[in-house]
Amino acid sequence: MQYNNYYVLLEVYETPAPSVLTMGGAENKIIHFQKCNGGIIVLNNKPEATSEDRTFFGQPRGLSTLFFTEMWERFSYYGMRAILIYYMYYSVTKGGLGFDQGTAASVMSIYGSMVYLSSVLGGYLSDRVWGSRRTVFIGGVLIMFGHIALSVPAGKMALFVSILLIVLGTGLLKPNVSEMVGGLYNEGDTRRDSGFTIFVFGINVGSLVAPYLVGWLGLSYNFHLGFSLAAIGMFLGLVQYWIGGKKYLSKDSLYPTDPLEPGDMKKLVVRSTIGLVAFILVLLLMALLGSLNLTNFVLLLTIIALATPVIYFTIFLTSKKVTATERKHVWAYLGLFIAAMIFWAIEEQGSSVLALFAANQTNNVVLGFHIPPAWYQSLNPLFILIYTPFFAMMWNRWGKKQPSSPAKFATGMLFAGASYLIMVIPVALFGSSAKVSPLWLVGSWAVIEIAELLISPIGLSVTTKLAPKAFQSQMMSMWFLADSAGQAVNAQIVKLYTPGNEANYFLGVAIVAIVAGIIMVALVKPIKNLMAGIK
């Protein structure tokens, strides 16, 4: 039934579940109706949030549910990530898989890339099939089973099964949790940036604790015990999300904003089948040519990860569902996306290049106490937790006078470059064979986390502001595709990080970031013009 450009949810007491009537349209709103006396239908519209809802540190109560969901999901992910590179390259006699370090670093990067690439799938299924809340829950279940797979001592097969499950699960969960955070705020609500900053704070609470606990279990006792603890963390997150979601999240998030028409499902199945068959044919061709190995497979995934955002930007810019104003917003977002991709390429090397530096070129004995290399992964969230209150207060105090999102991005890029300039110094002074003070790693992370707070929460926030109505969750996926593309690049460039070349490597990465920051400074005004008043 078509009417008034709204999707309508009709709640009928006599039926076990609500039915959805598609009532067309550009607005993609969900309005709640309820059946009452005499069969009269009355409006019961409940917005995602109101400006009066300030029960969670001045923020909407629903933010607490999403805060703790992401906290536990990040606990599981970063706990696993803190020990995974060591699990891959430690010898079999030490409980590892025996990969060489270069391969382990490359796999770590492409793994992270695929985790965020799958967010495209999560955004699509949320928008068209399940709605945000269901998609997040299904993703959490897959993540939990992915960690369970790693907890079983079944060698490389368990690793690859785990990678597949966590890649799919994270893709379903991450973009939709962030999209729901954006939905908690009305347009023009100045709490949005501070709300996302608090949300990122929650992410980093889980990320801070995980390397200590999972890293301690994994490196001191048994890798599989560490992975088991990561699985328990995701289970706790699912329980909290299930309970809190019923109480504090709007029913709107249970339903897709742009549901599939009956004929669309067939098209989806056909296109998915074609894509899968094409991928298999490429693998078969590589096998026939004798080039199907782990290195070339990683290269293939790198190409896919870089091509995907290009395809999606093309769709957004040419879709008839996108208005002229929204199209300008997408062009503005493209500039921010490229800057974010470069930033994440640097920041995400913490789990690969800096993890290797921590294990091989850092003096990890301080006052007689041995620091497990995995513990350095807590530096990222530690500094985020230290800095976040100051950034939140600063943005709140400045209010509408705060710098624009492009200006924050430009400043962040310069800080990111500076963080790698710091890493040049110890190698240049003491040589690549020396074990240097841990303070060099501490200093580098301290600087890049300033960059992260200028880019990550702001990027999450501006994505929800610039997203076209018809592609809200899929646009949210684009933010994670920036991370995916950055890590895909890493999967290739980390191979340049070799003994004796560390200083050149750090210097080259720093120069790229600083030049990108300078270019971003020059583009602040043009991007602001395209954003048309959105900060």
Language-model features: locations:
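Glycine-rich segments within core transmembrane alpha-helices of 12-TM secondary carriers
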Residues: 193-211, 218, 233, 478-490
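Hydrophobic core of transmembrane alpha-helices in multi-pass small-molecule transporters
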Residues: 157-173, 433-454
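Short amphipathic helix-loop junctions that connect adjacent transmembrane helices
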Residues: 82-103, 352-373
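Intracellular loop-helix junctions on the cytosolic face of multi-pass helical membrane proteins
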Residues: 32-61, 187, 215-351, 355, ...
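Conserved MFS/SLC helix-loop-helix module at the cytosolic interface between two early adjacent transmembrane helices
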Residues: 120-141
